[in-house]
């Protein structure tokens, strides 16, 4: 048996005592009174802040939203199935923030900025609050640079500028997501960082969008933030703010960003669910009273930075879904009043084969021609008016039996104008090609063709112009003006291509 040496034990104990550091920690704790439906009521937590993160005993995180006299209402950022009544909760002293870095480009993440694409972790050296204040009046400047969507109907008649907020609104299945994703595809090579936020959508729809981005090479400058329909309401409510924080990170680094919220109706529904479960008083359509503020504080973060801040920009394209074309419902009217214009997609146009189904008559951009290059202004200046007159005339012509020659030719041209606005999905056009297309239609060069031949002719003309008259593209891209030389080149190309096309059709 080994003898016990008292002096060794004494020295050991003394060493331990000397190493002891007395640390007093005050933790703000509470007790779970009730839990269910993604909401927990907590007794205690006396010094908790509104919006502060709290941590439950089993690891779930929640946000303190309701601060009442005798309890705190917390929304859970997870299922919270293991939380028990009577278990303890501690306040963390932190507001929701996410890590941000360039490494997020090309990744699919959730509302907490955790990767969900199975490609490992994302390194980040700094973090941002997901709810940061919007830029003030002095730190902004007016929108003046165009953000090309690649869609003729938008770029020629409802132009969007960098730093603008343009609402995409329409019924379900009218191609709202397609307009937004085409805009992202068109940013290739334009040094614009894109953030696509999917809120409450089917996982299969999100996967389809991600696949399109990967196939077209758009993922290298895009971040996808996804909270699907299976996610808790809290995370669906947070997802747009996470996307905005990531876009802001790049904007304040003097970069241009484009963010798409698809769609804000689902975020409002998630917020309504949370608010009703927290027993906040319901207002119009059972939405809480601060649902306007929910969207305004998000969309006000989109801006064109002033020269002193480096002229970065964040352009927002929020999407809102309507029920049977009713734009006077609560959420649509709210978002219309916050944004700088709206692109209205019509189910009737979509079903009649006009895609993108943009109703040019009631769509508007409040930034207007300030967000167009001079060449586009010169060519497409009166196209919106022409198209609106044609739509009115067409409605009237349904009841008229004998129409005079002028009316007939106006209707014929209008039909061809409408035809040239049609575009296939994921096939955005460069601004030079758009100018050529609009010029050809407005100046009557398509009048001699059948309506069925218009798209084929324009396709051939684009190829012909690119191959035989490369100077046209050079002039537009360098001067941004539709010069007399450019017009002469285009007229020549149209004439030559028309002759070739007619010969080909006859042959």
From Swiss-Prot:
GO molecular function: ADP binding; ATP binding; proton-transporting ATP synthase activity, rotational mechanism
Family: Belongs to the ATPase alpha/beta chains family.
One GO cellular component term noted in the UniProt record for this chain: chloroplast thylakoid membrane
Cellular location(s): Plastid, Chloroplast thylakoid membrane
Subunit structure: F-type ATPases have 2 components, CF(1) - the catalytic core - and CF(0) - the membrane proton channel. CF(1) has five subunits: alpha(3), beta(3), gamma(1), delta(1), epsilon(1). CF(0) has four main subunits: a, b, b' and c.
Annotated binding of ATP, by residue: 170-177
EC number: 7.1.2.2
Keywords: ATP synthesis, ATP-binding, CF(1), Chloroplast, Hydrogen ion transport, Ion transport, Membrane, Nucleotide-binding, Plastid, Thylakoid, Translocase, Transport
Organism: Pelargonium hortorum (Common geranium)
Keyword Membrane in annotation: yes
Site (Required for activity): 363
Membrane-related topology note: Peripheral membrane protein
Role according to the record: Produces ATP from ADP in the presence of a proton gradient across the membrane. The alpha chain is a regulatory subunit.
Catalytic function, reaction form: ATP + H2O + 4 H(+)(in) = ADP + phosphate + 5 H(+)(out)
Protein name: ATP synthase subunit alpha, chloroplastic
InterPro entries noted in UniProt: ATP_synth_asu-like_sf (IPR023366), ATP_synth_asu_C (IPR000793), ATP_synth_asu_C_sf (IPR038376), ATP_synth_F1_a_nt-bd_dom (IPR033732), ATP_synth_F1_asu (IPR005294), ATPase_a/bsu_AS (IPR020003), ATPase_F1/V1/A1_a/bsu_N (IPR004100), ATPase_F1/V1/A1_a/bsu_N_sf (IPR036121)
Entry keyword Cell membrane: no
PANTHER family, per database record: ATP SYNTHASE SUBUNIT ALPHA, MITOCHONDRIAL
């Amino acid at each position: 048996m080994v003898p016990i040496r008292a002096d060794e034990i004494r020295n050991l104990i003394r060493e331990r005592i000397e190493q002891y550091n007395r640390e007093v920690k005050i933790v703000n704790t509470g007790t779970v009174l009730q839990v269910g439906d993604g909401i927990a009521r907590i007794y205690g937590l006396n010094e908790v802040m509104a919006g502060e993160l709290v941590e439950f005993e089993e690891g779930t995180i929640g946000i303190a939203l309701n601060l009442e006299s005798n309890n705190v209402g917390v929304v859970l950022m997870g299922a919270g199935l293991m939380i028990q009544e009577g278990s303890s909760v501690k306040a963390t002293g932190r507001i929701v923030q996410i890590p941000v870095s360039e490494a997020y480009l090309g990744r699919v993440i959730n509302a907490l900025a955790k990767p969900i694409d199975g490609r490992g972790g994302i390194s980040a050296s700094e973090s941002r609050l997901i709810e940061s204040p919007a830029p003030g009046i002095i730190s902004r400047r007016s929108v003046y640079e165009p953000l090309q969507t690649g869609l003729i109907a938008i770029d020629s008649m409802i132009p969007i500028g960098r730093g603008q907020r343009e609402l995409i609104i329409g019924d379900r299945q009218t191609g709202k997501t397609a307009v937004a994703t085409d805009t992202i595809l068109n940013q290739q090579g334009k040094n614009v960082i894109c953030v696509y936020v999917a809120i409450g959508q089917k996982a299969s729809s999100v996967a389809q969008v991600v696949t399109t981005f990967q196939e077209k090479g758009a993922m290298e400058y895009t971040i996808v933030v996804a909270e699907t329909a299976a996610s808790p309401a809290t995370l669906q409510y947070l997802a747009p703010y996470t996307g905005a924080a990531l876009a802001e990170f790049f904007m304040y680094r003097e970069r241009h960003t484009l963010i798409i919220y698809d769609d804000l109706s689902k975020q409002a529904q998630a917020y309504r669910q949370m608010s009703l479960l927290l027993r906040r008083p319901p207002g119009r359509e059972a939405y809480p009273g601060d649902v306007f503020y929910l969207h305004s504080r998000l969309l006000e973060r989109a801006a064109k930075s002033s020269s002193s801040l480096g002229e970065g920009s964040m352009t927002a394209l929020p999407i809102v879904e309507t029920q049977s074309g009713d734009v006077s419902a609560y959420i649509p009217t709210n978002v219309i009043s916050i944004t700088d214009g709206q692109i209205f997609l019509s189910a009737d146009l979509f079903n009649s084969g006009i895609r993108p189904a943009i109703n040019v008559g009631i769509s508007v951009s409040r930034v207007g021609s300030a967000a167009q290059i001079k060449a586009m202004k010169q060519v497409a200046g009166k196209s919106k008016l022409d198209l609106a007159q044609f739509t009115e005339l067409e409605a009237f012509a349904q009841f008229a039996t004998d129409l005079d020659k002028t009316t007939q030719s106006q209707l014929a041209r209008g039909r061809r104008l409408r035809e040239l606005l049609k575009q296939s999905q994921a096939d955005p056009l460069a601004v030079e090609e758009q100018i050529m297309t609009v010029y050809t239609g407005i100046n009557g060069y398509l009048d001699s063709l059948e309506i069925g031949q218009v798209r084929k002719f324009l396709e051939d003309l684009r190829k012909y112009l690119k191959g035989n008259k490369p100077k046209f593209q050079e002039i537009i891209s360098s001067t941004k003006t539709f010069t007399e030389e450019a017009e002469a080149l285009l007229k020549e190309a149209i004439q030559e291509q028309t002759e070739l096309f007619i010969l080909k059709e006859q042959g």
